[in-house]
Amino acid sequence: MDTIAARALTVMRACATLQEARIVLEANVMEILGIAINRYNGLTLRGVTMRPTSLAQRNEMFFMCLDMMLSAAGINVGPISPDYTQHMATIGVLATPEIPFTTEAANEIARVTGETSTWGPARQPYGFFLETEETFQPGRWFMRAAQAVAAVVCGPDMIQVSLNAGARGDVQQIFQGRNDPMMIYLVWRRIENFAMAQGNSQQTQAGVTVSVGGVDMRAGRIIAWDGQAALHVHNPTQQNAMVQIQVVFYISMDKTLNQYPALTAEIFNVYSFRDHTWHGLRTAILNRTTLPNMLPPIFPPNDRDSILTLLLLSTLADVYTVLRPEFAIHGVNPMPGPLTRAIARAAYV
């Protein structure tokens, strides 16, 4: 299936080079389009030309690219337009070994297949405590009954620790059971002034320490912590104290947008509003997938089918921009006039 996807990418990108009818095509583009169009026309009985000039010819070439995109992604879009019918035989065109594919396309598909079939350490973009169900007021003393050290979450990436005079204790428990981190990068600081439960202000005196695995860590410096070694706090002073521990970032096996080059840009290209026809077409295609149909996914996609669909659909969007096809989509009423931000914004409501 990798070669089928690579051929689909190659052919669509070749079509995207047809910026004008009289352009001098590169030799490899002529070879790719010549073989692909001949095979496609023979199997589907369409009339795609290598140099589309009229609207009908541009539509035919775009429909060829749409067929290839859907076939490579394994999507059966169904009846979405009175002007277009998906040709399931296109998969046979893409399976033709005579159609060459570029090194770039092959490498990109190999990257998608390779990265989605395994896991690796990645810097996570969300706060470590993002999904906590409760939070505490920053800078306000809090102590549970029968305890001398209390650690609480006070933000999506922050905890604060209240310590009685002379108290010491481990606080790594508050990190455990969250996010399955491989490494957590922390910074700790003394809270110089904090509010007691009665509302009066109190100062944290110098001498409070935070240690990892028995080694004292300097305040205000990034600490690499594996989440397993003892994270110990100690208040040797004769007054209550508070410290703040911030998770600068953490590394885990969860997939991110860095698993594929320019995945963020590909997603933006897919979900951008070009006109109402593209908006309706993209929505209809993504309705047949697990991806959201109008707005980008909340979390990075982590399976091959989703990332491959985004890559192919982003390339189809470029072809749409170049060929400027005009056809109807069921349930879509195009609005005449120039594209404005207000029109684009209204399409997502």
From Swiss-Prot:
Gene name per UniProt: Segment-7
GO molecular-function term, one example from the UniProt record: structural molecule activity
Protein name, entry field: Core protein VP7
Assembly notes: Homotrimer that assemble in a complex of 260 capsomers on an inner scaffold composed of VP3.
Phylogenetic placement of the source organism: Viruses, Riboviria, Orthornavirae, Duplornaviricota, Resentoviricetes
The keyword S-adenosyl-L-methionine is annotated on this UniProt entry: no
Top-level division of the source organism's lineage: Viruses
GO biological process, one term: fusion of virus membrane with host plasma membrane
Glycosylation site residues: 287
A Pfam family it matches: Orbi_VP7
Keywords, comma-separated and alphabetical: Capsid protein, Glycoprotein, Outer capsid protein, Virion
Record-linked Gene3D superfamilies: 2.60.120.170, Bluetongue Virus 10, subunit 1, domain 1, Bluetongue Virus 10, subunit 1, domain 3
Function: The VP7 protein is one of the five proteins (with VP1, VP3, VP4, and VP6) which form the inner capsid of the virus.
Transmembrane segments: none
